[in-house]
Amino acid sequence: MVTYSANYSTSFQKRSPFAVHNRRSNMARMDFNNIVGDPFALITISTSLIAWLLSFATCVISDIQGAFPNFAWWAVGYMLCAIIGISLVLASQTSHVYGVAIVGYLAAGLTFTTLAVNSLIYDDQASKQAGAAGFILQSMVTIVWIFYFGSSSQTSSRPYLDSMGAGKEHPSYRNSKPLSTNYGARPETVVSGNQPPQMYTSAQLNGFETSSPVSGYPPTAANGAENGTQNRFVGPAIGSQSNLGGGSTLGADHPSTPNEVSQPTVYPYRAKAIYSYEANPDDANEISFSKHEILDVSDVSGRWWQAKKASGETGIAPSNYLILI
């Protein structure tokens, strides 16, 4: 019997630590076209900057004219840092990575701007009232940002806002995981040309026999339980074998052909990419796709989906990068 060790299976292979380090060491690339090409990012950042300049200028004038609450200066400085940080995150398209931290910072900023409004709006001095108006406008933008960054990608509003900039967005954060990174071993839905089939002997499969035979491979009583087990477990993994007679064994007469494993021909589902993904160069089964790209999907069970691109390229894609449409 010709058998292959489990080490040949891609499910048991461990990636090189150097390859993992190289993939994780890729930093996000800054591209301010992601802001210019996204109406939501452009409008909110522009509005927040105008509101900040209004509050800063009026606070300077109010401080020159007379007594001024020092707490308002802290709100001015804090919101400037928040606006710069959000601009960098949107420019690098890493909102799914830093979204939780951004919501926390914005919640604190909303508190500061609200207290600054309370300190300035009731004063009779016109410059202080104008400063309060600037803080009110910043608070409104902050509320919108909290809703955006705090919303999950599964909501209807987040993909809609992200789709506004689909024409000019570029994949900038290499292979970052927006949700869970604990995938573990995934099923091999496509067999690579350079990978031998995963097969085991009857001794290795002892205790895993099924009570009923696999369709198309009936066990024969004349050959005993061992040959029946071999027919059930080894036979289906070889696409080139169409007939296994009684007493047949895997040898030179029945060569294995791993490339003949059929791929799905029906893709009943359609999915939209909510993040860009670059396939692992060490795994020929994965496919790359860009944000907002539409893919045809054959199976939506599990963490990796068998997908087909518009160009006809097929492979597997991580399910947490896709949303069904």
Swiss-Prot record:
Pfam families: SH3_1 (PF00018). Keywords: Cell membrane, Membrane, SH3 domain, Stress response, Transmembrane, Transmembrane helix. It comes from the Eukaryota. SMART domains: SH3. Residues 266-325 form the SH3 domain. Residues 1-40, 92-96, 151-325 are cytoplasmic. Residues 62-70, 118-129 are extracellular. Residues 173-182 have a biased composition (Polar residues). Residues 160-182, 236-263 are annotated as: Disordered. It is found in: Cell membrane. PROSITE patterns: SH3. SUPFAM superfamilies: SH3-domain. InterPro entries: SH3-like_dom_sf, SH3_domain, Sho1_SH3. The chain crosses the membrane at residues 41-61, 71-91, 97-117, 130-150. The keyword Cell membrane applies. It is a multi-pass membrane protein. GO terms for cellular component: plasma membrane. Forms homooligomers. Plasma membrane osmosensor that activates the high osmolarity glycerol (HOG) MAPK signaling pathway in response to high osmolarity. Belongs to the SHO1 family. This is High osmolarity signaling protein SHO1. The gene is SHO1.
